[in-house]
Regions:
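Internal alpha-helical scaffold of NAD(P)-dependent oxidoreductase catalytic cores
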Residues: 1-84, 112-119, 129
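Acidic, glycine/proline-rich low-complexity segments that act as flexible tails and inter-domain linkers
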Residues: 3, 137-142
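C-terminal substrate-binding/catalytic lobe of Rossmann-fold NAD(P)-dependent oxidoreductases
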Residues: 68-124, 135-139
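A short beta-alpha structural unit
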Residues: 128-134
């Protein structure tokens, strides 16, 4: 949906021109390398939050006897929310999020927030909830 090009402005300009020539309908964003890394982390962690949030909705529906798919359809019918990352269980037939990106990026942000003394309780809660509901640990454990 967008190309993010991070690094030295002179070098990035060539890449942006290339991407815009090859993919004229896809906008490009030229930023510093630190900003491009932040964009990746924040984008992935937002989607991890979304997965966790819809798993919470699933828990609520299960506890109250509501049909999750009916509720999900109504909520995701709002174009601001969208349907991606709302299937419970997910495409891997497990709850929560796994894989190589979401767990790594969420934990990296937790560390970066802690190093800067920025409250990250919300990030930690998402991680703890994911560990609680996820049956398959398919990410590297350090």
């Amino acid at each position: 949906e967008r190309n993010v090009v991070g690094g030295d402005k002179e070098l990035c300009t060539d890449f942006v021109c290339f991407f815009e020539a090859c993919f004229p309908k896809i906008p490009s964003v030229m930023v510093s390398s630190d900003e491009s890394e932040a964009i990746k982390y924040f984008s992935n962690v937002f989607l991890a939050y979304k997965v966790a949030y819809f798993n919470k909705i699933y828990d609520f529906c299960h506890a109250t006897g509501m049909d999750y798919n009916n509720v999900r359809k109504g909520v995701t019918g709002d174009s601001r929310i969208g349907k991606s990352h709302t299937q419970v269980p997910g495409i891997d037939n497990d709850r929560g999020f796994g894989g190589t990106c979401f767990p790594k990026d969420l934990n990296s942000l937790i560390t970066q927030f802690e190093e800067r003394n920025i409250n990250c309780d919300m990030l930690k809660e998402v991680w703890l909830y994911n560990e609680e509901i996820r049956t398959v640990i398919d990410w590297p454990v350090t």
